[in-house]
Amino acid sequence: MRFIRDIHAGKEAAGKPTISFEFFPFKTPEGEETFFGKTLPALMTAGPDYASVTYGAGGSTREKTLEIVERIQNDFGLTTMAHLTCIRHTRAEIGGILDEAANRGIQNILALRGDPPSGEEWAQTEGGFEFASELVEFLRERGGFGIGAAGFPEGHIDCAEGRETDWLHLVGKINCGADFVKTQMFFDNA
C-alpha cells in the first residue's frame, strides 16, 4: 500500500482531484456482507484513490476498524487509512493498537482526539493523550505511518476561544508531524 501523503502529492502534481471514501464499521453481519459483496465493489468503479474507516465514539469499534481496513487493502488493493482516537486509551494501549495496525499492514492513521459516547463529556484518560497533536507527535516519533489530522474550517465545536485559536491548534498538529489535513465535506449544509 502507499502513504496517503504520496497519493495527495501525485494527484496535486497532475492537477487532478483526490477521491476518497469514508466508511463506518458495520453493526451487523448482514451489513458487512452487503458492504464487501455489493457496496464496495460498486464504489470501486469510481476509481477511489483511498478509503478511511472510522473508529466509533469512545473507540467502540477499535477491533472492527483495523479488521475492515486490512480486508479492504487485501481484498480490493485499495490504500486505506484507519482512524485512531485518544479517548479511553493510555499511551501504552495506543502503542499496542499501532503494533496491531502495523502487523496488519496498515500504513496510514488519521489521528483524532475523538468524541465520547453520546451523553458523556470529554475526559482525558489517565496516562493518555489530551490533544490530537500529542497523538500526532507520538505517531511521528514512533515512525512507520503516514499521519493525517483533522481540520475544522468552521471551527471545532469544543473550541470556545474562536477560529484563530482553532487555526493555531491545526498548525500545532502540523508542527507535531501531520502529513496532511482532512476536513468534513459538509459541516452545515442548510
Task: Name the predicted role of every residue range.
Residues A9-A14, L40-G47, L66-G77, L98-I106, ...:
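Acidic (Asp/Glu)-rich catalytic clusters
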Residues P17-P25, D49-V53, T80-L84, I109-A111, ...:
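Hydrophobic faces of well-ordered beta-strands that scaffold small-molecule active sites
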Residues T18-F35, T80-A92, G148-T165:
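Active-site mouth loops of central-metabolism enzymes
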Residues F26-P29, P48-E67, D115-G127, A178-A190:
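Glycine-rich, proline-tolerant flexible connector loops at the mouths of alpha/beta enzymes
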Residues T34, C86-E100, E126-E130:
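Glycine-rich anion/phosphate-binding loops
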Residues N108-N175, F180:
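Conserved anion-binding
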